[in-house]
Amino acid sequence: MSEYKLIAVDMDGTLLRSDKSLDPDTIRDVEEAARQGIQVAYSTGRAVPELEAYVRQLPCMRYAVALSGALVYDFQERKSVFCQMLSGAYIEEIVRVAAQYDAMAHFLTEDESIVRIDQVSQMADFHMGIYQPMFLKLTRKVDDMRAEAKRFDAIPKVNVYFRSAKDRAAGYEALKRLPLSFAFAEGASLEMNAAGVTKASGLRALTKHLGISMTETAGIGDADNDRAMLEAVGWSVAMGNGAEDIKALCDAVTEDNDHNGVGKAIRSLLTIKSL
């Protein structure tokens, strides 16, 4: 019997293949963990609407640590069990900096994804082309993000998709004075949450809800925005396609996301064998 009661799994670059699909073998391995009484939870920067298609394929994954830790959501009860917002006072400044670099701002609430209508067709320019079909289908599209920003007293998460990693670095320099949590993701994305919010803080909220300890959790991820979660869990696994510094901090390294790395890690955990 595994000593771990919860496995937190990143999505993009980890649970999902490069084409954003689920490997049937991964589905079977996650289902086997569930049959053995282990919760497998999403740990993702995505919003709840962006998870629904995967939840239909993996109904055994009841919980999500979503919005990079700002939201913990229960898909069985269809409600949030934890949410931490960033102040609306910072949203307009984020949008201003995004406009300065001709970047794409993205507001994420508990139940909505909001973007500027004319930028969705240009997502490849922001290194986000793989997500364009999802954004076309699931986002609420507005004409003016500055006007939209004024509607919010608080919001769980704001992303900015830059045209280059160089622009992202400059945008971060302009924004880092704000009391927020920052994470780099994808090719040139900057993710922002309230100060102290990380995938680790969201996972702690979930473990509290479930009545288990962080030492009884495992985590699987590939990128900088998984770092805090991987450092906090009892057993950490990096994907074979992950960043080298992420591999260096983890307890083990599995296969890449196109070769069922998550499933291999889960099987290792269930059988208590090393990867």
What are the functions of these language-model segments?
Residues 51-55, 171, 246, 262:
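Hydrophobic packing residues within well-ordered alpha-helices of enzyme cores
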Residues 31-35, 99, 176, 231, ...:
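Anion (oxyanion) recognition and catalysis
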Residues 21-128:
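Active-site phosphate-binding/coordination module
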Residues 2-6, 17, 23, 190-275:
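Mg2+-dependent phosphoryl-transfer enzymes with acidic/Ser/Thr/Gly-rich catalytic loops
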Residues 1-11, 28:
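Non-catalytic pre-domain segments flanking phosphatase-related domains
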Residues 89, 97, 101-104, 108-220, ...:
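Conserved acidic, metal-coordinating active-site core of Asp-based
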Residues 37-41, 61-62, 156-157, 215-216, ...:
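Short active-site oxyanion
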Residues 58-60, 67-68, 76, 176-178, ...:
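Short, structured coil segments at secondary-structure junctions
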